Amino acid sequence: STAEKLSGACVPGMPNLHSHAFQRAMTGLTEIGGGTENNFWSWQKVMYDFLAALGPEDVEAIAAQLYVEMLKGGYTSVGEFHYLHHGPGGKTYSDPNEMSNRIFSAASQTGIALTHLPVLYAQGGFGGQPPLDGQKRFLHDIDSFARLVTELQARCRSLPGTETGMAFHSLRAVSPEMMSEILKFITDGPVHIHIAEQMREVTQCVEWSRQRPVEWLFEKQHIDSRWCLVHATHMTEEETSSLAKSGAVAGLCPSTEA
């Protein structure tokens, strides 16, 4: 009875379930002609260098422009996989929620529906490798991340069209112990994770755990309809079957996986 009635034929708005808004401003910076070998890892290096100069105002402006472009293209909701939390060098802002608040503001200005997904990122690689300098703006420990998510969830209650879930960047960026502790503390809302995106990641995971990424995740955690496995590109038939039976979603990203 409260739904708005529209005249004529209507097409439902599309959801964009996996956005890194700040990366929109990197367009054109990472693919070089002339036989240069480009891959995910060379792209990642450029991304680290690029974000070192971004401040809160930049992130809000970039996100607002991106969300307008999404709306023009028919996307009416977005899942923002947000891991740019801190200032240069990893210095915490006076308001630790500063960067997330900028995403909320961009969504509010443009009118797009937002599922905000603050990302836990705690290490530089499998087995607790130290983070690179370019990763320091992403980092949280268990307590600070749990506090961040709790505060953002509370704020969302007063923001129409907005909710907050959570995300783990990847198996290589979060220890098993941290993942389990956070899941005990945050028991509702969507959970997203990058997984099995690159064969190098799969190989490193096997070297670390003797299991492939999706195989490891399903053995160690209870995967259900809360979960979105982003990319999930390199899976065996057994892993694919486990995902299909779980109720979880495979989050495909056609523009980066083509």
What are these regions (language model features)?
Residues 219-258:
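Active-site-adjacent C-terminal substructures of enzyme catalytic domains
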